[in-house]
Curated annotation (Swiss-Prot):
Gene that produces this protein: nuoB
Biological classification of the source: Bacteria, Pseudomonadati, Pseudomonadota, Gammaproteobacteria, Pseudomonadales
SUPFAM superfamilies (UniProt xref): HydA/Nqo6-like
Localization per record: Cell inner membrane
PANTHER family registered for this protein in UniProt: NADH DEHYDROGENASE (PTHR11995), NADH DEHYDROGENASE [UBIQUINONE] IRON-SULFUR PROTEIN 7, MITOCHONDRIAL (PTHR11995:SF14)
Membrane topology classification: Peripheral membrane protein
Top-level class of the enzyme under EC nomenclature: translocase
Gene Ontology terms, MF aspect: 4 iron, 4 sulfur cluster binding; iron ion binding; NADH dehydrogenase (ubiquinone) activity; NADH:ubiquinone reductase (non-electrogenic) activity; quinone binding
Similarity section: Belongs to the complex I 20 kDa subunit family.
UniProt entry tagged with the keyword Membrane: yes
Binding annotation for [4Fe-4S] cluster: 67-68, 133, 162
Assembly notes: NDH-1 is composed of 13 different subunits. Subunits NuoB, CD, E, F, and G constitute the peripheral sector of the complex.
Name the record gives this protein: NADH-quinone oxidoreductase subunit B
UniProt-listed InterPro entries: NADH_UbQ_OxRdtase-like_20kDa, NADH_UQ_OxRdtase_20Kd_su
Organism of provenance: Azotobacter vinelandii (strain DJ / ATCC BAA-1303)
Length: 224
């Protein structure tokens, strides 16, 4: 079986995967409001209801690459209880899942397989990059490791750490739910590529910059 790793080209045609399916467009609810106040408001309410259901019933795919996967599975245990966020039903097949966590080191030989699994997932679908290795290659600055899974997959949330704690994974999951709640998709019976409005999600590092600057006493690692 032959695999081919495809790099994202922003200048490529819309038919090329995954640019065509991940196109960012203007909010369709705004156009509806201008054309028809009642229908626009109704669609806005329906979009909120649909997004509420989507963000509170994520179906994760049971997939892991390295040590970060151990931290991710720890979030499913009783002390952390990921069931509070509606994402505890792990699926064994990507065709039954809409949410994937790339947890661990992504090697060149594994990248086409990850891309194939992503293509088999249900729409709409989301991806979290968990850990330094998945985000940027981590300490493996070598030819055999992909320096960031966003080179061949669209990523919704990045979780830093080596490895991140389960609490960090839960925070990333809540950020993903916040992003899903602000999405706007066409509500129609049409099946196919449809434009998606995604709100800009600012970096948590920039949001908490002032808070970090005001810190005067730094705690030791065993006190965190």
């Amino acid at each position: 079986m032959q695999y081919k790793l495809t790099r994202i080209d922003p200048d490529a045609s819309y038919e090329q995967y995954p640019i065509g399916e991940r196109e960012t467009v203007t909010d369709p609810s705004e156009g509806q409001v201008h054309r028809n106040i009642f229908m626009g408001k109704l669609e806005d309410v329906l979009s909120g209801a649909v997004n509420w259901g989507r963000k509170n019933s994520l179906w994760p795919y049971n997939f892991g690459l390295s040590c970060c996967y151990v931290e991710m599975t720890t979030a499913f245990t009783a002390p952390h209880d990921i069931a509070r966020f509606g994402a505890e039903v792990i699926r064994a097949s990507p065709r039954q899942a809409d949410f994937m966590v790339i947890a661990g080191t992504c090697f060149i030989k594994m990248a086409p397989i990850i891309q194939r699994l992503y293509e088999q997932m249900l729409e709409p679908k989301w991806v979290i990059s968990m850990g330094s290795c998945a985000n940027s290659g981590g300490m493996y600055d070598i030819y055999s490791v992909v320096q960031g899974v966003d080179k061949f997959l669209p990523i919704d949330v990045y979780i830093p750490g080596c490895p991140p704690r389960p609490e960090a994974f839960l925070q990333g999951l809540m950020l993903l739910q916040e992003s899903i709640g602000q999405e706007r998709r066409p509500l129609s019976w049409v099946v196919g590529d449809q434009g998606i409005y995604r709100a800009e999600m600012p970096s948590q590092r920039e949001l908490r910059r002032e808070q970090r600057i005001q810190v005067t006493n730094l705690r030791s690692p065993d006190e965190v």
